[in-house]
């Protein structure tokens, strides 16, 4: 059975560092609105998608790294010049992607278990 290592990061710089530390491995990245002190994201779609993503991780077919990235607070996220939008071309949260490939699920797609399972299980 395939396994994954989970890395939780906050912000673009930590995300970039985590990607570099795991170079050469298959990386899945999940981008979510940051959580408050009670562990709840400001992004309702992210709250809805997280359990679907967690369930989907059970379907990974290769050893990989799962980076859970909190993108920051809502005002930062809405800034069109933030690094996630500029450097990674991420336009919405939640977003799940297979790093370095065109495979990406955005917003409501992250709540569809069949799509989530597919992204984790495709070669």
Curated annotation (Swiss-Prot):
Disulfide bonds join 43-46. The oxidized protein is reduced by TRXR1. Keywords: Acetylation, Cytoplasm, Disulfide bond, Redox-active center. It is found in: Cytoplasm. It holds the Pfam family TXD17-like_Trx. Its main location: cytoplasm. InterPro entries: Thioredoxin-like_sf, TXNDC17-like, TXNDC17_dom. GO terms for molecular function: peroxidase activity; protein-disulfide reductase [NAD(P)H] activity. The active site is at 43 (nucleophile), 46 (nucleophile). GO terms for biological process: tumor necrosis factor-mediated signaling pathway. GO terms for cellular component: cytosol. Residues 41-123 form the Thioredoxin domain. The modification N-acetylalanine is found at residue 2. The record marks 44-45 as: Contributes to redox potential value. Disulfide reductase. May participate in various redox reactions through the reversible oxidation of its active center dithiol to a disulfide and catalyze dithiol-disulfide exchange reactions. Modulates TNF-alpha signaling and NF-kappa-B activation. Has peroxidase activity and may contribute to the elimination of cellular hydrogen peroxide. Interacts with TRXR1 and DYNLL1/DNCL1. Belongs to the thioredoxin family. This is Thioredoxin domain-containing protein 17.
């Amino acid at each position: 059975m395939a396994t994954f290592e989970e890395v939780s990061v906050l912000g673009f710089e930590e995300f970039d560092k985590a990607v570099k530390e795991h170079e050469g491995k298959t990386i899945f990245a999940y981008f979510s609105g940051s959580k408050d002190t009670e562990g709840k994201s400001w992004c309702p779609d992210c709250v809805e998608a997280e359990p679907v993503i967690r369930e989907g991780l059970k379907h990974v077919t290769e050893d990989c790294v799962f980076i859970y990235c909190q993108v920051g607070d809502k005002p930062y996220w809405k800034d069109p010049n933030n690094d996630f939008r500029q450097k990674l071309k991420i336009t919405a949260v939640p977003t799940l992607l297979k790093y370095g490939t065109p495979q990406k699920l955005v917003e409501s797609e992250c709540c569809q278990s069949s799509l989530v399972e597919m992204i984790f299980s495709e070669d």
